[in-house]
């Protein structure tokens, strides 16, 4: 097997085995919280929907990249190609949009309690799911054109403005439609990334102010609540940093490719790997920075590894009790 193909197969295989269990764990745990506690904090609603969007990215793109890397050809017919490309475009845009919403929501939570900010805090927190649904409907409408331009790969000569997407092609036919599509993608990502960065800058500034002001009151109830708020903020910053790094690497390669007269297909594969990595790597950050999820994972691990008599004596039960003290958003 060609060394590059082997490396590509291993890379996409790692994304699959990390991404699917990680996103599924987040979704299942927060669904259980909703069922048991009858409520779910707005931030956790956003994280659940982010994990759902990431899971769709994995199923609609990364798995097919893996299958292609190990040599499986011509797996999708015309209708399946349309569905796969449409699902990938919408779910990837949802993943970016929800990450941006998460950073903006956390920024609003940390904003001063003025009349305007208090109103925004209440409205955004109460309508987090509604905002996500509106975003989803908007993106479905915007990407409906992909159904028309997508088709299974053919042996005939394709248009010079055709994007080759694993088993399928997206044919834009004209230079104008090709450039409009590329410009739209770039502007969309730039706007959302700019919102993420601006929100994160404000969060970092607020965190620094917080460190100076609450050193003496960390033991109080207010200090504990505030500490939970700011731990959640740090988690959001890490997620944004991960996306911005991957976005920067991806678009740096894209700009470089524009300067070349001939683009090696391997460079496109690397870009796909970078753009898809967020869907698999972000669950790791979410789990290790969210105490509720982290404690659930520790409890599940302890339950499997402790002897049966230790479980019966209540050692595992004591671990699960500590999980109920978690107050983080």
Where are these regions (language model features)?
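Transmembrane helical core of 7TM receptor-like proteins
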Residues: 1-329
């Amino acid at each position: 097997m060609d060394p590059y193909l082997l490396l590509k197969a291993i890379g996409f295989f790692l994304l699959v085995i990390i991404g699917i269990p990680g996103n599924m764990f987040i979704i299942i745990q927060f669904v259980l919280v909703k069922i048991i506690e009858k409520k779910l904090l707005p931030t956790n609603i956003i994280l659940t929907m982010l994990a759902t969007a990431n899971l769709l990215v994995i199923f609609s793109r990364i798995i097919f990249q893996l299958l292609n890397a190990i040599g499986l050809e011509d797996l999708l017919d015309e209708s399946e190609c349309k569905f796969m490309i449409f699902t990938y475009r919408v779910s990837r845009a949802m993943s970016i949009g929800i990450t941006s919403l998460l950073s903006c929501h956390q920024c609003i939570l940390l904003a001063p309690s003025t009349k305007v900010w208090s109103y925004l805090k209440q409205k955004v927190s109460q309508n987090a799911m509604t905002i996500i649904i509106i975003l989803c409907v908007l993106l479905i409408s915007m990407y409906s054109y992909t159904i028309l331009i997508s088709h299974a790969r053919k042996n005939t000569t394709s248009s010079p403005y055709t994007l080759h997407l694993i088993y399928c092609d997206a044919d834009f036919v004209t230079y104008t439609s090709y450039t409009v599509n590329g410009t739209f993608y770039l502007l969309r990502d730039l706007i959302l990334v700019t919102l993420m960065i601006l929100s994160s800058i404000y969060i970092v500034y607020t965190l620094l102010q917080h460190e100076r002001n609450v050193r003496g009151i960390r033991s109080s109830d207010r200090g504990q609540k505030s500490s939970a708020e700011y731990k959640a903020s740090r988690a959001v910053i890490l997620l944004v940093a991960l996306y911005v790094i991957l976005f920067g690497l991806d678009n740096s390669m894209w700009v470089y490719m524009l300067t070349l007269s001939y683009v090696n297909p391997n460079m496109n594969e690397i870009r796909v790997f970078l753009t898809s990595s967020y869907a698999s790597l972000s669950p790791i950050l979410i789990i290790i920075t969210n105490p509720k999820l982290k404690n659930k994972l520790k409890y599940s691990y302890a339950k499997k590894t402790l002897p049966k008599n230790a479980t019966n004596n209540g050692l595992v039960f004591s671990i699960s009790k500590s999980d109920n003290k978690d107050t983080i958003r």
